[in-house]
């Protein structure tokens, strides 16, 4: 019996919506990255894009533990000499929470060409409204852990 390899036509993609209200940023990122890669599916293969679409709402209400809002730094570079820009995680979450959560989720995925295709299925919104109601997304609950 030969090993089964899924093809792109064999995969049925679901839509999930995650409410980020009071969810720790790292826990949210790992759950969303696993959904985007399709790690929970029986047809999972690391070389095939078999993940689902993920919608993250209330990105501006995500939780960050300890004093990481002031301690953690976010960096980006313009490509020009002296073009390194930095800001704290708290300032980044205040200015553009969607981009900060997208960067965190994509950072939890392997850095290859397949991740670029999987990241296109990630949709992050700072409010509770999203334009994907016609796809009938399922609510995905992230369990709270007592700390």
From Swiss-Prot:
- Identify a single GO molecular function assigned to this protein: structural constituent of ribosome
Keywords of this entry: Ribonucleoprotein, Ribosomal protein
**Signal peptide feature range:** none
CDD domains, A to Z: Ribosomal_L13
Cellular component, GO, one term: cytosolic large ribosomal subunit
Q: A Pfam family matched by this chain, by name?
A: Ribosomal_L13
| Record keyword Plastid present | no
Q: Write down the superkingdom of origin.
A: Bacteria
Q: Which GO terms describe its biological process?
A: negative regulation of translation; translation
| Keyword DNA repair annotated | no
Q: Which HAMAP family match?
A: Ribosomal_uL13
Sequence similarity: Belongs to the universal ribosomal protein uL13 family.
Q: How does it assemble?
A: Part of the 50S ribosomal subunit.
Reported function: This protein is one of the early assembly proteins of the 50S ribosomal subunit, although it is not seen to bind rRNA by itself. It is important during the early stages of 50S assembly.
| Protein name per UniProt | Large ribosomal subunit protein uL13
Q: From which organism does this entry originate?
A: Corynebacterium glutamicum (strain ATCC 13032 / DSM 20300 / JCM 1318 / BCRC 11384 / CCUG 27702 / LMG 3730 / NBRC 12168 / NCIMB 10025 / NRRL B-2784 / 534)
Originating gene: rplM
């Amino acid at each position: 019996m030969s090993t089964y390899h899924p093809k792109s036509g064999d995969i049925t993609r679901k839509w999930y919506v995650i409410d980020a209200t009071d969810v720790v940023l790292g826990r949210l990122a790992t759950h969303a990255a696993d959904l985007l890669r399709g790690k929970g599916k029986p047809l999972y293969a690391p070389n095939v894009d078999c993940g689902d679409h993920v919608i993250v709402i209330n990105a501006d209400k995500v939780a960050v533990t300890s004093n990481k809002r002031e301690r953690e730094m976010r960096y980006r570079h313009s490509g020009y000499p002296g073009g390194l820009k930095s800001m704290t995680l708290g300032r980044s979450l205040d200015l553009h929470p969607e981009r900060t959560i997208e960067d965190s989720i994509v950072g939890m995925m392997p850095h290859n060409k397949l991740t670029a295709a999987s990241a296109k299925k990630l949709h992050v919104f700072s409010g509770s409204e999203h334009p994907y109601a016609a796809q009938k997304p399922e609510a995905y609950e992230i369990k709270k852990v007592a700390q």
